């Protein structure tokens, strides 16, 4: 897991963008694909971004923040995805996210439509709601199935080529599906209280931390072994965390 540092949330920059987001929020319930509410891009500071807010009833700012972080920590591809920065006081964090649309490797004809999207997504937690902003969105694909190319979301959306336009729709659907899944997770989750934020920011572990805090600091362990009231989490041969009755009692490194 990449080191976590203080994050500056990337806000909407102008009143017209706030208006665009609000109008989109009112209209998006009419824009549904495969049961997913679609969040559409708009221009902000010369690039296409996707930003909106989602209401989450009966959830505190702290719970939404911790649940959101845990959602990504437990699902990341650790080779390419990570939490870039966070600020526990403000309830904000930024992730580096990769979406892949890959066809059957045996279907060579379909391979030409394979695409990978890299982006950053900033989140801001508040009582009963979460705001997100996806930006720096870039698609990587092969032109004619051979030559590697890249295009940002603005180019995809404005292109006359059906292939590139289809890529923009793929990204919008994948990102919207992620937000839907995240919100459903937050609604059902009952997160543990997190207090060791400075230790987490240093990617360290100390006695007294709970499992959620250790995951936020180190990620998911390679193996877990339970014996009575003791749980042993092995991150490597040189890094082992032992819990007794749910709290860290020993660190071997």
What are these regions (language model features)?
Residues 191-253:
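Residues within mature, well-folded domains
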Residues 15-192:
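Ser/Thr-rich, low-complexity intrinsically disordered terminal regions
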């Amino acid at each position: 897991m990449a080191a976590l540092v203080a994050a500056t949330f990337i806000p909407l920059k102008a009143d017209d963008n706030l208006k665009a987001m609000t109008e989109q929020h009112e209209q998006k319930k009419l824009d549904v694909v495969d049961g997913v509410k679609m969040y559409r891009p708009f221009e902000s500071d010369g690039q296409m971004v996707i930003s909106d807010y989602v209401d989450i009833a009966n959830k505190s700012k702290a719970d939404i923040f911790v649940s959101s972080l845990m959602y990504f920590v437990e699902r990341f591809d650790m080779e390419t995805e990570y939490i870039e920065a966070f600020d526990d006081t403000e309830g904000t964090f930024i992730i580096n996210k990769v979406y892949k649309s890959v066809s059957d490797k045996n279907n060579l004809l379909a391979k030409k439509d394979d695409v990978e999207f890299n982006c950053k997504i900033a989140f801001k937690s508040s009582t009963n709601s979460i705001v997100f902003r996806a930006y720096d969105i870039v698609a990587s694909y092969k032109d004619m199935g051979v030559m590697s190319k890249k295009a940002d979301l603005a180019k995809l959306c404005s292109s006359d080529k059906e292939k590139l336009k289809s890529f923009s729709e793929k990204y919008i659907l994948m990102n919207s599906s992620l937000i839907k899944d995240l919100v459903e997770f937050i609604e059902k989750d009952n997160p543990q209280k997190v207090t060791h934020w400075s230790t987490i920011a240093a990617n360290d572990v100390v006695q007294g931390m709970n499992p959620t805090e250790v995951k936020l600091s180190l990620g998911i362990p390679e193996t877990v072994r339970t014996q009575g009231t003791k749980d042993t989490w092995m991150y490597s041969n040189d890094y082992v965390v032992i819990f007794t009755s749910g709290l860290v009692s020993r660190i071997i490194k």
